Design a protein with these regions (language model features):
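Active-site neighborhoods of divalent-metal-dependent phosphate/nucleic-acid chemistry enzymes
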Residues: 83-119, 124
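Residues at secondary-structure transition points
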Residues: 29, 46, 73, 98, ...
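Alpha-helix capping/helix-boundary segments
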Residues: 19-20, 51, 124-125
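Acidic, PIN/NYN-like endoribonuclease modules and their adjacent C-terminal/linker elements
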Residues: 105-108, 115-117, 123-149
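Residues that scaffold the ATP/ADP-binding catalytic core of kinase and kinase-like folds
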Residues: 23-24, 58, 67, 128-129, ...
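Short, well-structured N-terminal submotif of metal-dependent ribonuclease cores
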Residues: 1-47
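PIN-domain endoribonuclease scaffold, especially VapC-family toxins
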Residues: 37-94
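Short, flexible loop segments at the rims of nucleotide/cofactor-binding pockets, characterized by
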Residues: 21-24, 68, 93-100
Length: 149
């Protein structure tokens, strides 16, 4: 049976690295709906090559390697999820607002360039909610992950 939600166009979303880890490394229960949305195509996950490089680097952090090992989950499997589900975009122009954490700026820039929802738990990003809304970006902390769908 089809619902009105099924008929809606997919939502463009930018997922920061910690959200990606929640989806496929930590199996965060609060991220289940977002993971399902990505896997079923209800989310158009936008990312850049630099975001993939960051994910690959983070997957080598000792605390992440420990988690991957405990789950018998190769880092390549996480990167394969990225490659399978992401819609790769060129680097975006600088957004009108700068994040105090330079590592997060690329996520903000891409979300602003595509008027996409941005998913992050980073305090330096979350404090920019009102400014990002002025740019057409809905900022969703993990627990409200599908609120804009």
């Amino acid at each position: 049976m089809s619902t009105a939600a099924d008929a809606q166009a997919p939502v463009r979303r930018v997922l920061d690295t910690n959200i990606v880890l929640d989806l496929w490394v930590f199996d965060e229960p609060k991220a289940t709906d977002l993971r399902h949305s990505v896997e079923t195509g209800r989310t158009h996950w936008l990312a850049t090559a630099a975001m993939r490089e960051e994910l690959a680097r983070v997957l080598e952090y000792p605390q992440i390697v420990k988690r991957l090992t405990a789950r018998a989950l190769p880092a390549d499997t996480v990167l394969a999820h990225f490659d399978r589900h992401v819609q790769l975009q060129p680097d975006a122009p600088k957004a009108p607002y700068a994040c105090k954490d330079a590592d997060d700026q690329k996520f903000i820039d891409l979300a602003v360039a595509h008027s996409a929802a941005l998913h992050s738990k980073d305090a330096q990003v979350l404090c920019m909610k009102k400014r990002l809304e002025r740019c057409g970006v809905a900022l969703n902390p993990l627990m409200d992950v599908l609120e804009t769908a």
